[in-house]
């Protein structure tokens, strides 16, 4: 066999069509996040890494490319990083430098993030999880955009279902000769039942360079956009708290997305106008065989104008 094996990937393809993304998915790496005066946070992260491919090239040197990708990821995660989006940005920029045939590189990362907290009523220590979402795109002109965000779970209560329950309760109380003021006061203090859903909220922020946002703040915004937070540990007072809180703030799936937008505007009113915000809410319905979904992708400047109007 010849010592010089043919470079098939560098040959011309049978069909001259360029490809938007070619790469590897599911690359697992440990990532350490720096914390001042504390041990770093260690994440088991999964990376997807892509480059674009011109129409004149058959392949992207997948096996050789994987060595480069693995080497760059090892270098990027060898020391504690300030942010996961910076790790993605660093790898994307190195990919552009390493490949003379590509014009754009994209790196995506997901990891599970543990949150230490206390139960809402009994103040018992517990832990919650959130999925971190980070990505970066670098191009041949030296431009890099980075994205950071999260996916969290919570609960919601249907306002329509609750409204029907409240109407029924009002009719019953009127039939028992309870006066109108007392009925109004009771219904104001005691929210009526509505069917509940497990809610899934996703919130990401993308800017040119490193987004000037805090991951924990984004997690809080996403969790608080639903009717109530949920907890792994819950004694009876905690269950009562979550039930009461959720029914006191019943929300449609659309309301949750709008709450995310409003929460982001309140926390970060000065983000650049060209910041891209992605907000999604999916609710697992309890009384239907289908689920509910709403989303919005918008520039921050547009969101700011809509809320002000």
UniProtKB/Swiss-Prot annotation:
The keyword Metal-binding applies. Its cofactor is Fe(2+). Binds 1 Fe(2+) ion per subunit. GO terms for molecular function: GTP cyclohydrolase I activity; GTP cyclohydrolase IV activity; iron ion binding. Pfam families: GCHY-1. GO terms for biological process: tetrahydromethanopterin biosynthetic process. Its EC number is 3.5.4.39. InterPro entries: GTP_cyclohydrolase_FolE2/MptA (IPR003801), GTP_cyclohydrolase_MptA (IPR022840). It is an enzyme of class 3 (hydrolase). It catalyses: GTP + H2O = 7,8-dihydroneopterin 2',3'-cyclic phosphate + formate + diphosphate + H(+). It comes from the Archaea. Keywords: Hydrolase, Iron, Metal-binding. The record marks 158 as: May be catalytically important. The keyword Iron applies. Pathway: Cofactor biosynthesis; 5,6,7,8-tetrahydromethanopterin biosynthesis. Belongs to the GTP cyclohydrolase IV family. NCBIfam families: GTP cyclohydrolase MptA (TIGR00294). Converts GTP to 7,8-dihydro-D-neopterin 2',3'-cyclic phosphate, the first intermediate in the biosynthesis of coenzyme methanopterin. Homodimer. This is GTP cyclohydrolase MptA. It comes from Natronomonas pharaonis (strain ATCC 35678 / DSM 2160 / CIP 103997 / JCM 8858 / NBRC 14720 / NCIMB 2260 / Gabara) (Halobacterium pharaonis). The gene is mptA.
């Amino acid at each position: 066999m010849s010592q010089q094996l043919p470079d098939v990937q560098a040959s011309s393809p049978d069909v001259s069509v360029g490809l938007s993304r070619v790469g590897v998915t599911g690359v697992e790496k440990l990532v350490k996040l720096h914390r001042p005066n504390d041990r770093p946070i260690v994440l088991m992260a999964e990376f997807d890494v892509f480059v674009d491919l011109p129409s004149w090239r058959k392949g992207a040197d997948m096996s050789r490319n994987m060595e480069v990708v693995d080497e760059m990821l090892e270098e990027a995660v060898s020391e504690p990083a300030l942010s996961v989006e910076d790790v993605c940005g660093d790898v994307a920029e190195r990919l552009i430098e390493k490949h003379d045939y590509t014009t754009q590189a994209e790196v995506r990362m997901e990891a599970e993030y543990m949150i230490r907290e206390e139960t809402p009523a009994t103040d018992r220590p517990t832990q919650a999880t959130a999925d971190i979402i980070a990505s970066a795109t670098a191009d041949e002109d030296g431009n890099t955009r980075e994205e950071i965000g999260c996916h969290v779970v919570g609960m919601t209560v249907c306002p329509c279902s609750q409204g029907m329950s409240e109407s029924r309760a009002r009719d019953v109380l009127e039939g028992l000769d309870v006066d109108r003021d007392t009925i109004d006061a009771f219904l104001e203090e005691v929210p009526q039942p509505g069917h509940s859903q497990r809610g899934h909220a996703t919130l990401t922020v993308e800017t040119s360079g490193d987004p000037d946002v805090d991951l924990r703040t984004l997690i809080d915004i996403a969790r608080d956009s639903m009717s109530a937070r949920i907890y792994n540990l819950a004694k009876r007072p905690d269950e009562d708290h979550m039930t009461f809180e959720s029914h006191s703030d019943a929300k449609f799936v659309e309301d949750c997305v709008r709450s995310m937008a409003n929460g982001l505007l309140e926390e970060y009113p000065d983000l650049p106008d060209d910041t891209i915000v992605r907000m999604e809410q999916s609710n697992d319905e309890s009384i239907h065989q289908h689920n509910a979904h709403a989303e919005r992708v918008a520039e921050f400047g547009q969101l700011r104008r809509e809320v002000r109007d």
